[in-house]
Structure formats: structure tokens, C-alpha cells
């Protein structure tokens, strides 16, 4: 047991009291991102080290690993606490998304350490999808780079409203206030183009030396703001899903015996209570909630984020992927939508292609009708493109094989977020955030069926010498 944990348990008056206190602490999920070698893994290692979250055997192992793989000379290479893959240690970079947990007396934290290399941008998007705050590291020697802009845009696209710009390696710039001010102004100029109402904070620090990470730096008397840890402990995260309308995607129909039929899943938003009138979509059939079953017994009500099983008063046809919501709410099913896409495959996304998609437990097929634009991450301008390349970000029009019940991603990430799956390899090739569902009344009628468009795209791709015309292009 490490000393910090032992001290916390002693302060609470025993293990049982400490465990109860842990349950009532708020949880903050955040990620670290930025360009390669900006010091993301070192920063997380410093946070764990300075909050005394490292066990003695880990510290001993870290000393040995620093001698073998370290990049800091005689000093401890704190990045090795996070870079666990052999390839990461040998190259001195982060490849996969690494998750770490730690807690202080004020809050619990889950950290996602994301890679900085451009070819691993897809990993960064994966890490950002569950986070509420992003720490954007900037090397004080280099300033704002393309990857900084890319990660900032992806973070805001995925609904993150709190950005902490950590200007790292200030020790290599002699802790210059002028350097900090210049980078701060450069980033604010860029951030003015980012969508949404953002909470942006700036902290000058040195992850290697520990300046302004968990304790105030004596080398930067000109900075009177909070340390990075103080920002993480005090930032107010508003859980918008609690105030949103009820959304309950069915993940599993639980039928252990003839006397029980329940619908299991995680309440995506809002609240549900026993006796509430609910509606099942897309069928539109209504019923009442008879029971709310959890792992520790029945409940009278449940809130967003809780895993529950709902039992209804009527035996109606409900399958995996169906959506339960309040009976008095109107949410029409749509067959088309404009979707913000982060493309993750080497084979580019092109109009006419079809993919399997998964959204809130529902799996179906979608066709790419067109690409409206790709975002240039250098200046956030929009440009017309024929296809969306690896790591490209753009707005795409999709048509689904069947009507779906969708929310805008910014309103509800669960019922507004989807993934693209290659139908041959079964590999996830893209992430999508619903920008705007298109109602049946406003959707343009299609002259050709989904099968005809898919066959046309297949022929043009593999048999170009046949000279088949582009049905989408001729519309």
C-alpha cells in the first residue's frame, strides 16, 4: 500500500469509512493530448508521483526501467509509468491509449494518455470520446503546432467543453513569461474559430521538474494562477445528460426464466421511475415501468449513467437496439443524417460506399451519399474534396437502410455517436457524430435504390473500363 493511500484511510478512520467516502467523491475523466514529444506521458507520471500514487515496487521497477529505457539521463523517466508497450518504450513514444486511475482527497480521476503522432489520431479520438476535460500540452520551444490544432478541434467536436492548455518544458525556456504570453495569445487566436462555448485555462509548467504540476513553482513568480492539479480538482463539470430527456437504449433482453422478461442497458440520459409511461421506438408501442432492477436490488428510480434492467407491465416486442423514452416525447425516426466523421482507415471514405454502423446498441447499414467538406485543421476552413483520407475530418451525408432514432451528438453522445465498420474485415474504420438528423419530410427522394447505388459504386471501382456513369454524380 502506498503512503498516500494509507494516509487517506487513516484520515477517514478505517477502510470501510474510506470506501464510503470514495463513493461520494466526484469523478473527472480527462485526457492528455498534443504533438509528439510534448511530454504527455511524463506529465501523467509526474501527477502520479507527486500525489504519491506509486507503490514501492513500482518505484523500484521505475528506477531499473529508467536505466534501461530512460531518456532523462540520471533522472527518473516518469513517462515509463504510462508507456507500457514494449514498442512505446523502445521508441520513446505513446502508441495506444493508456488509461490510469488516481484520486486525491477532493476528487477521483481517470486519465487517458493519447498518442501525439498524426498516424495515431484515431487513437486520440477514441480516448476523447468518454472524457469531460482535455489537457492540451504545448512544447514551450515549439509553440502551437498542427497536432495541437487537430486535437483541439477533435476534442470540441466530441463535446469536450473544458480545455486546459499546459505549456510544458518551461525550464528549457528559462521560465520566460514572454514565451508563455506569446503562446497563450497564439492559441487564443486559433481557439476563436473553435465551435461552442469553451472554458479555456492556461498553466505554464515543467512536467520533468514538477513546476506548477502539483505544487506551485518558485521559478515562475510571475504566475499567480492555480497549479494543474488545483485546476483538475476544482473545475466544475456540468453533467448535461442528467437534464436531458430520458433515453434508454436496449442492449440485452434478459429472459432467465418464463417468469421474468427484462430489458438491460445503461440509461444514456435523463431519469426513469417506477410507474412512468414509456414508449418504445421505432415501433411506437407504449407501456409502464413495473420494476427497475439493479445488481443490488430493485430501485424506485434511476439516473443517467446507471446500468439497469427495466421490467414493463406489458409483454411487447422489444429487441436489442430499440430505444425507450418518455411516452409524451416526440422523436421521429429518420433515414438520413449529416454526420461529422473522423476517418480512421487507410482506404479513404468515398461517396457511394456502404458500411455497417453501430449506434447505441443498434447495428445497421449506411450508404455515403456525399461529402460536403473536409476541415483544414490549420485554419479550420472548409474545402471540397472527393474523398476523406486517413485522419481526415469532414461532414458527410448518410442514408440508412432502415429508419433510426437519433439525437444530435452535442445533445446526447450515446444516441448521437456511431462507428463505421468495414463489412469485409469487420474492422472499425471511422467514428461519426450526428450533426443533424434529416426528417423524412425534408429528405430528398432517391431516384435509385440502395442496392442500385451500391452496385454502381462497385462496378465503377473494380471495372472502370466498362465506363459506367456515376449515378450519384448525375443526380
Curated annotation (Swiss-Prot):
Pfam families: GTP-eEF1A_C, GTP_EFTU. It catalyses: sulfate + ATP + H(+) = adenosine 5'-phosphosulfate + diphosphate. Residues 168-171 are annotated as: G4. GO terms for biological process: hydrogen sulfide biosynthetic process; sulfate assimilation. It is an enzyme of class 2 (transferase). Residues 113-116 are annotated as: G3. The keyword GTP-binding applies. Residues 206-208 are annotated as: G5. InterPro entries: CysN_GTP-bd, CysN_II, CysN_NoDQ_III, G_TR_CS, GTP-eEF1A_C, P-loop_NTPase, Small_GTP-bd, SO4_adenylTrfase_lsu. Residues 92-96 are annotated as: G2. Gene3D superfamilies: P-loop containing nucleotide triphosphate hydrolases, Translation factors. The keyword Transferase applies. Residues 34-41 are annotated as: G1. GTP binds at residues 34-41, 113-117, 168-171. Pathway: Sulfur metabolism; hydrogen sulfide biosynthesis; sulfite from sulfate: step 1/3. Residues 25-239 form the tr-type G domain. Its EC number is 2.7.7.4. Keywords: ATP-binding, GTP-binding, Nucleotide-binding, Nucleotidyltransferase, Transferase. Signal peptide: none annotated. GO terms for molecular function: ATP binding; GTP binding; GTPase activity; sulfate adenylyltransferase (ATP) activity. Belongs to the TRAFAC class translation factor GTPase superfamily. Classic translation factor GTPase family. CysN/NodQ subfamily. With CysD forms the ATP sulfurylase (ATPS) that catalyzes the adenylation of sulfate producing adenosine 5'-phosphosulfate (APS) and diphosphate, the first enzymatic step in sulfur assimilation pathway. APS synthesis involves the formation of a high-energy phosphoric-sulfuric acid anhydride bond driven by GTP hydrolysis by CysN coupled to ATP hydrolysis by CysD. HAMAP family: Sulf_adenylyltr_sub1. Heterodimer composed of CysD, the smaller subunit, and CysN. This is Sulfate adenylyltransferase subunit 1.
